[in-house]
Protein backbone atom coordinates (compact mmCIF):
# COMPACT_ATOMS: atom_id res chain seq x y z
CA UNK A 1 0.00 0.00 0.00
CA UNK A 2 1.17 3.53 -0.73
CA UNK A 3 0.15 6.87 0.74
CA UNK A 4 0.73 10.39 -0.56
CA UNK A 5 1.02 13.56 1.51
CA UNK A 6 1.26 17.25 0.66
CA UNK A 7 2.62 20.04 2.84
CA UNK A 8 2.88 23.81 2.63
CA UNK A 9 4.53 26.42 4.82
CA UNK A 10 5.26 30.15 4.76
CA UNK A 11 7.38 32.42 6.94
CA UNK A 12 7.93 36.14 6.55
CA UNK A 13 11.28 37.87 6.80
CA UNK A 14 12.16 39.89 9.88
CA UNK A 15 15.01 40.44 12.26
CA UNK A 16 18.55 39.42 11.45
CA UNK A 17 19.78 36.46 9.44
CA UNK A 18 20.94 33.89 8.70
CA UNK A 19 18.03 31.64 7.78
CA UNK A 20 17.77 27.85 7.90
CA UNK A 21 16.16 26.09 4.94
CA UNK A 22 16.20 22.34 4.41
CA UNK A 23 18.33 21.98 7.53
CA UNK A 24 21.06 24.20 6.03
CA UNK A 25 22.15 27.59 7.35
CA UNK A 26 22.03 30.20 4.58
CA UNK A 27 23.56 33.67 4.96
CA UNK A 28 20.98 36.41 4.46
CA UNK A 29 20.54 39.91 5.82
CA UNK A 30 17.16 39.01 7.35
CA UNK A 31 15.92 36.10 9.39
CA UNK A 32 12.54 34.39 9.27
CA UNK A 33 9.89 35.15 11.87
CA UNK A 34 8.83 31.90 13.49
CA UNK A 35 8.25 30.17 16.81
CA UNK A 36 10.80 27.48 15.90
CA UNK A 37 13.82 27.98 13.63
CA UNK A 38 11.51 28.89 10.71
CA UNK A 39 12.70 26.19 8.31
CA UNK A 40 9.87 26.33 5.76
CA UNK A 41 11.20 23.33 3.82
CA UNK A 42 11.28 20.99 6.80
CA UNK A 43 7.94 22.31 8.05
CA UNK A 44 6.28 21.63 4.68
CA UNK A 45 7.96 18.22 4.55
CA UNK A 46 6.81 17.38 8.08
CA UNK A 47 3.25 18.38 7.17
CA UNK A 48 3.40 16.19 4.06
CA UNK A 49 4.54 13.20 6.11
CA UNK A 50 1.85 13.77 8.74
CA UNK A 51 -0.77 14.19 6.04
CA UNK A 52 0.22 10.93 4.40
CA UNK A 53 -0.51 9.03 7.62
CA UNK A 54 -3.63 11.12 8.38
CA UNK A 55 -2.05 12.54 11.54
CA UNK A 56 -2.89 16.22 11.17
CA UNK A 57 -0.17 18.83 10.87
CA UNK A 58 2.87 20.11 12.72
CA UNK A 59 0.75 22.74 14.47
CA UNK A 60 -1.12 19.97 16.24
CA UNK A 61 2.02 18.11 17.31
CA UNK A 62 4.33 21.09 17.94
CA UNK A 63 2.02 24.06 18.70
CA UNK A 64 3.46 27.57 18.55
CA UNK A 65 1.56 28.29 21.77
CA UNK A 66 3.86 25.91 23.67
CA UNK A 67 7.18 27.40 24.79
CA UNK A 68 8.64 23.89 24.65
CA UNK A 69 8.98 24.37 20.88
CA UNK A 70 10.33 27.95 20.93
CA UNK A 71 13.45 28.04 18.80
CA UNK A 72 13.12 24.32 18.07
CA UNK A 73 15.47 22.71 15.56
CA UNK A 74 13.23 21.66 12.67
CA UNK A 75 15.51 18.72 11.90
CA UNK A 76 14.60 17.29 15.29
CA UNK A 77 10.90 17.91 14.59
CA UNK A 78 11.24 16.14 11.22
CA UNK A 79 12.93 13.14 12.87
CA UNK A 80 10.10 12.98 15.42
CA UNK A 81 7.52 13.06 12.63
CA UNK A 82 9.35 10.31 10.75
CA UNK A 83 9.33 8.13 13.88
CA UNK A 84 5.53 8.48 13.81
CA UNK A 85 5.48 7.46 10.13
CA UNK A 86 7.54 4.35 10.88
CA UNK A 87 5.33 3.54 13.88
CA UNK A 88 2.40 3.38 11.43
CA UNK A 89 4.33 0.80 9.39
CA UNK A 90 5.44 3.07 6.55
CA UNK A 91 8.76 4.22 5.11
CA UNK A 92 9.55 7.01 2.70
CA UNK A 93 9.39 6.18 -0.99
CA UNK A 94 10.42 9.65 -2.11
CA UNK A 95 10.04 13.33 -1.28
CA UNK A 96 9.86 16.33 -3.60
CA UNK A 97 10.29 19.82 -2.12
CA UNK A 98 9.77 23.15 -3.90
CA UNK A 99 11.11 26.30 -2.22
CA UNK A 100 9.50 29.52 -3.46
CA UNK A 101 11.72 32.54 -2.86
CA UNK A 102 12.93 35.58 -4.77
CA UNK A 103 15.88 35.78 -2.40
CA UNK A 104 18.21 34.46 -1.24
CA UNK A 105 19.25 32.20 -4.07
CA UNK A 106 18.97 28.57 -3.03
CA UNK A 107 20.99 26.83 -5.78
CA UNK A 108 24.31 26.75 -3.87
CA UNK A 109 22.62 24.97 -0.94
CA UNK A 110 20.36 22.43 -2.67
CA UNK A 111 22.78 19.48 -2.47
CA UNK A 112 23.39 20.06 1.24
CA UNK A 113 19.62 20.27 1.82
CA UNK A 114 19.08 16.96 0.03
CA UNK A 115 21.82 15.34 2.10
CA UNK A 116 20.41 16.65 5.41
CA UNK A 117 16.88 15.53 4.56
CA UNK A 118 18.03 12.10 3.37
CA UNK A 119 19.92 11.64 6.64
CA UNK A 120 16.94 12.70 8.77
CA UNK A 121 14.53 10.48 6.84
CA UNK A 122 16.92 7.51 6.80
CA UNK A 123 16.81 7.16 3.04
CA UNK A 124 19.03 7.22 -0.02
CA UNK A 125 19.92 10.59 -1.49
CA UNK A 126 18.19 9.51 -4.71
CA UNK A 127 14.83 9.54 -2.91
CA UNK A 128 15.04 13.25 -2.10
CA UNK A 129 14.55 16.13 -4.51
CA UNK A 130 14.76 19.80 -3.55
CA UNK A 131 14.33 22.59 -6.04
CA UNK A 132 13.75 26.32 -5.86
CA UNK A 133 11.81 28.76 -7.96
CA UNK A 134 10.75 32.40 -7.89
CA UNK A 135 7.39 33.99 -8.58
CA UNK A 136 8.93 36.39 -11.11
CA UNK A 137 8.75 39.22 -8.55
CA UNK A 138 5.01 38.68 -8.02
CA UNK A 139 3.31 38.31 -4.64
CA UNK A 140 4.85 38.37 -1.16
CA UNK A 141 7.76 36.10 -2.12
CA UNK A 142 8.43 38.19 -5.22
CA UNK A 143 8.52 41.33 -3.07
CA UNK A 144 11.05 39.55 -0.81
CA UNK A 145 8.66 39.63 2.14
CA UNK A 146 9.09 35.94 2.92
CA UNK A 147 9.62 32.39 1.73
CA UNK A 148 7.10 29.65 0.94
CA UNK A 149 7.57 25.95 0.38
CA UNK A 150 5.54 22.98 -0.85
CA UNK A 151 6.40 19.33 -0.33
CA UNK A 152 4.98 16.05 -1.57
CA UNK A 153 5.86 12.62 -0.19
CA UNK A 154 5.11 9.07 -1.19
CA UNK A 155 5.13 6.49 1.58
CA UNK A 156 5.08 2.72 1.19
CA UNK A 157 4.44 -0.10 3.62
CA UNK A 158 7.66 -1.17 5.31
UniProtKB/Swiss-Prot annotation:
Record-level GO BP terms: isopentenyl diphosphate biosynthetic process, methylerythritol 4-phosphate pathway; terpenoid biosynthetic process
Keywords assigned by UniProt, alphabetized: Isoprene biosynthesis, Lyase, Metal-binding
The protein's annotated pathway: Isoprenoid biosynthesis; isopentenyl diphosphate biosynthesis via DXP pathway; isopentenyl diphosphate from 1-deoxy-D-xylulose 5-phosphate: step 4/6
Residue sites binding 4-CDP-2-C-methyl-D-erythritol 2-phosphate per the record: 9-11, 35-36, 57-59, 62-66, 101-107, 133-136, 140, 143
Catalytic reactions on record: 4-CDP-2-C-methyl-D-erythritol 2-phosphate = 2-C-methyl-D-erythritol 2,4-cyclic diphosphate + CMP
CDD domains: MECDP_synthase (cd00554)
Site residues by UniProt (Transition state stabilizer): 35, 134
InterPro entries cross-referenced by the UniProt entry: MECDP_synthase (IPR003526), MECDP_synthase_CS (IPR020555), MECDP_synthase_sf (IPR036571)
Cofactors demanded by this protein: a divalent metal cation
EC number(s) on file: 4.6.1.12
Cofactor binding mode and count: Binds 1 divalent metal cation per subunit.
Gene Ontology molecular-function annotations: 2-C-methyl-D-erythritol 2,4-cyclodiphosphate synthase activity; metal ion binding
Binding of a divalent metal cation, residues: 9, 11, 43
Family indicated by similarity: Belongs to the IspF family.
Subunit and interaction comment: Homotrimer.
Matches recorded under NCBIfam families: ispF
HAMAP family registered for this protein in UniProt: IspF
Physiological role: Involved in the biosynthesis of isopentenyl diphosphate (IPP) and dimethylallyl diphosphate (DMAPP), two major building blocks of isoprenoid compounds. Catalyzes the conversion of 4-diphosphocytidyl-2-C-methyl-D-erythritol 2-phosphate (CDP-ME2P) to 2-C-methyl-D-erythritol 2,4-cyclodiphosphate (ME-CPP) with a corresponding release of cytidine 5-monophosphate (CMP).
Name of this chain's protein: 2-C-methyl-D-erythritol 2,4-cyclodiphosphate synthase
Gene (UniProt): ispF
Amino acid sequence: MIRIGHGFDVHRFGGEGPIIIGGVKIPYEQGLIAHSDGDVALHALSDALLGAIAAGDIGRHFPDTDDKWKGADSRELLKDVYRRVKAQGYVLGNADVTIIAQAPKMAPYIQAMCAAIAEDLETDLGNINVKATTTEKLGFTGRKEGIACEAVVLLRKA
